[in-house]
Amino acid sequence: MDRNLAIELVRVSEFAALAASKHIGRGNEKAADQAAVDAMRKCLNSLTISGTVVIGEGERDEAPMLYIGEKVGQGGPNVDIALDPLEGTTITAKGGENAMAVIALAQDCLLYTSPSPRDLDLSRMPSSA
């Protein structure tokens, strides 16, 4: 990975953490998470990458932003992204410690993603005897 891109990823996670930190101890998990998501998405969209979120905030119909399959960036190398803008929403809302922003980036098609339950055809599974 390009050294400059690695430094930019530090900035992305830092921006998300700082946005969430404004909600420490305020009791509102959704506001803390939304602040982190908004900040991380804004930063990701400023990078010169063609990114695809492969591990994110959930399926498209469950998460308005940073959902699995969402495209981010301004164009550049194709990359897969795994992220959690705020790991520890309850901790943050209650004023606790050790919440974090998480992001990983790899070349296109190199991050493993497990299939969602919707992708599994259970009728093809052998029945247990």
Region roles according to the model:
Residues 77-87, 91-110:
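DPxDG-like acidic metal-binding loop motif
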Residues 112-119:
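Conserved small/polar residues in nucleotide/adenosyl-binding loops
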Residues 77, 120-121:
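Short, exposed beta-strand "edge-strand" segments with a Pro/Gly-rich flavor and a Y/T-containing core
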Residues 53, 122-123:
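Short, hydrophobic secondary-structure boundary micro-motifs
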Residues 59-61, 91, 119:
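Short, flexible micro-motifs
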Residues 1-82:
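N-terminal subdomain of lithium-sensitive/metallo-dependent phosphomonoesterases centered on the IMPase/IPPase/PAP
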Residues 124-129:
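Hydrophobic alpha-helical segments, chiefly the membrane-spanning helices
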